[in-house]
Amino acid sequence: MAYLVAVTACVSGVAHTYMAAERLEKLCLLEKWGVSIETQGALGTENRLADEDIRRADVALLITDIELAGAERFEHCRYVQCSIYAFLREPQRVMSAVRKVLSAPQQTHLILE
């Protein structure tokens, strides 16, 4: 079973941050992937990812419209990065990218436009 860590963050830090986190949880359940999700919203950082979780993750998914607080934590990881809009509009495209990156070398970074 694959294990993902993710961060969601939008400009206002209200609805879309949490909508993306909720949708990702459901998609990972369908894929039978474990997932831990950190949200960076109006209330600050919630469910902050532990360094150990990031280290053991197969892939990090950075769903953001803003500069993430602590983005350097993911430099050594395979990751897929996309906007909140792209994820909410085309979640299957993003999940397909995650599947591809799962088998890529460490430190593979895929940024979706």
UniProtKB/Swiss-Prot annotation:
<protein>
    <recommendedName>
        <fullName>PTS system fructose-like EIIB component 3</fullName>
        <ecNumber>2.7.1.202</ecNumber>
    </recommendedName>
</protein>
<dbReference type="GO" id="GO:0016301">
    <property type="term" value="F:kinase activity"/>
</dbReference>
<keyword id="KW-0597">Phosphoprotein</keyword>
<feature type="modified residue" description="Phosphocysteine; by EIIA">
    <location>
        <position position="10"/>
    </location>
</feature>
<dbReference type="Pfam" id="PF02302">
    <property type="entry name" value="PTS_IIB"/>
</dbReference>
<feature type="domain" description="PTS EIIB type-2">
    <location>
        <begin position="1"/>
        <end position="100"/>
    </location>
</feature>
<keyword id="KW-0418">Kinase</keyword>
<dbReference type="GO" id="GO:0090582">
    <property type="term" value="F:protein-phosphocysteine-D-fructose-phosphotransferase system transporter activity"/>
</dbReference>
<dbReference type="InterPro" id="IPR003501">
    <property type="entry name" value="PTS_EIIB_2/3"/>
</dbReference>
<dbReference type="GO" id="GO:1990539">
    <property type="term" value="P:fructose import across plasma membrane"/>
</dbReference>
<keyword id="KW-0808">Transferase</keyword>
<comment type="function">
    <text>The phosphoenolpyruvate-dependent sugar phosphotransferase system (sugar PTS), a major carbohydrate active transport system, catalyzes the phosphorylation of incoming sugar substrates concomitantly with their translocation across the cell membrane.</text>
</comment>
<dbReference type="InterPro" id="IPR050864">
    <property type="entry name" value="Bacterial_PTS_Sugar_Transport"/>
</dbReference>
<dbReference type="GO" id="GO:0009401">
    <property type="term" value="P:phosphoenolpyruvate-dependent sugar phosphotransferase system"/>
</dbReference>
<dbReference type="GO" id="GO:0005737">
    <property type="term" value="C:cytoplasm"/>
</dbReference>
<dbReference type="GO" id="GO:1902495">
    <property type="term" value="C:transmembrane transporter complex"/>
</dbReference>
<feature type="active site" description="Phosphocysteine intermediate">
    <location>
        <position position="10"/>
    </location>
</feature>
<keyword id="KW-0598">Phosphotransferase system</keyword>
<keyword id="KW-0963">Cytoplasm</keyword>
<dbReference type="InterPro" id="IPR013011">
    <property type="entry name" value="PTS_EIIB_2"/>
</dbReference>
<keyword id="KW-0813">Transport</keyword>
<dbReference type="InterPro" id="IPR003353">
    <property type="entry name" value="PTS_IIB_fruc"/>
</dbReference>
<dbReference type="InterPro" id="IPR036095">
    <property type="entry name" value="PTS_EIIB-like_sf"/>
</dbReference>
<dbReference type="GO" id="GO:0022877">
    <property type="term" value="F:protein-N(PI)-phosphohistidine-fructose phosphotransferase system transporter activity"/>
</dbReference>
<keyword id="KW-0762">Sugar transport</keyword>
